[in-house]
């Protein structure tokens, strides 16, 4: 069996508020393998976004370990984590987090430039991915000049442009109207499958979750695998 591209082992997360401790994650174990798709469902406030941030090394667990492409991030400094993320992990959020003063092309170039890709090559790759998401005619437009669906397409192109091992998505269509959401979901699914990328999807959409290879439910800090027909 191939090695996981991302793995969490016995992950706990505790927040301390004054004299009170709140345990958000309790011994979470999950592994994501090449080309695998995983959905995580759960009520609002159940810790799904916290788990996703820990999986992507944007946050650290109170205890337990995280490995990305076989590398344990536990003892890495923030610069090393950033390099590892940029090489192996893409992110798509409910809110696009595009830089408002930059064009669509410049936003998609950003992760490539951070990896040390030459400007000319980064622009070429960014143009390719914006074409893949149907925005070849919007290269010079800034986020404020794009619709909600177009902005999310730019965010998808940005996440996939470095060709990461896995993509972590937190309600990527939750801020869109149903018709636009369906279109973006179909696009995202096709692109990830075509590029043989693994992904983890945090969602409230049980119908969408059922399409993934595996489904997990996060409740009271405990992550448990569930059957698609039980969603």
From Swiss-Prot:
PROSITE patterns: ABC_TRANSPORTER_1, ABC_TRANSPORTER_2, LOLD. Pfam families: ABC_tran (PF00005). One of its GO terms (cellular component) is plasma membrane. Gene3D superfamilies: P-loop containing nucleotide triphosphate hydrolases (3.40.50.300). It is a peripheral membrane protein. ATP binds at residues 42-49. InterPro entries: AAA+_ATPase (IPR003593), ABC_transporter-like_ATP-bd (IPR003439), ABC_transporter-like_CS (IPR017871), ABC_transpr_LolD-like (IPR015854), MacB-like_ATP-bd (IPR017911), P-loop_NTPase (IPR027417). It is an enzyme of class 7 (translocase). It comes from the Bacteria. Transmembrane segments: none annotated. Residues 6-231 form the ABC transporter domain. Keywords: ATP-binding, Cell inner membrane, Cell membrane, Membrane, Nucleotide-binding, Translocase, Transport. It is found in: Cell inner membrane. One of its GO terms (biological process) is protein localization to outer membrane. Part of the ABC transporter complex LolCDE involved in the translocation of mature outer membrane-directed lipoproteins, from the inner membrane to the periplasmic chaperone, LolA. Responsible for the formation of the LolA-lipoprotein complex in an ATP-dependent manner. The complex is composed of two ATP-binding proteins (LolD) and two transmembrane proteins (LolC and LolE). Belongs to the ABC transporter superfamily. Lipoprotein translocase (TC 3.A.1.125) family. This is Lipoprotein-releasing system ATP-binding protein LolD. The gene is lolD.
């Amino acid at each position: 069996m191939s090695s996981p591209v991302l793995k969490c082992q016995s992950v706990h997360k505790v927040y301390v508020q004054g004299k009170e401790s709140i345990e958000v994650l309790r011994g979470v174990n999950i592994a994501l393998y090449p080309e695998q798709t995983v959905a995580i469902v759960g009520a609002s406030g159940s810790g799904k976004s916290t788990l996703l941030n820990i999986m992507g090394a944007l946050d650290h667990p109170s205890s337990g370990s995280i490995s990305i492409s076989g590398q344990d991030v536990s003892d890495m400094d923030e610069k090393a984590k950033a390099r590892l993320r940029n090489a192996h992990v893409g992110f798509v959020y409910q809110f696009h987090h595009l830089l408002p003063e930059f064009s669509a092309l410049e936003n998609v170039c950003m992760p490539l430039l951070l990896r040390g890709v030459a400007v000319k090559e980064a622009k070429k790759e960014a143009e390719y991915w914006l074409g893949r998401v149907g925005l070849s005619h919007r290269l010079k437009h800034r986020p404020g000049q794009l619709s909600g669906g177009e902005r999310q397409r730019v965010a998808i192109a940005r996440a996939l442009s470095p060709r990461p091992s896995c993509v972590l998505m937190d309600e990527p269509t939750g801020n869109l109207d149903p018709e636009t959401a369906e279109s973006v979901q179909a696009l995202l699914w096709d692109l990830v499958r075509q590029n043989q990328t693994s992904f983890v999807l945090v969602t409230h959409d049980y119908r969408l979750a059922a399409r993934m290879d595996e489904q997990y439910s996060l409740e009271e800090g405990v992550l448990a695998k569930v059957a698609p027909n039980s969603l």
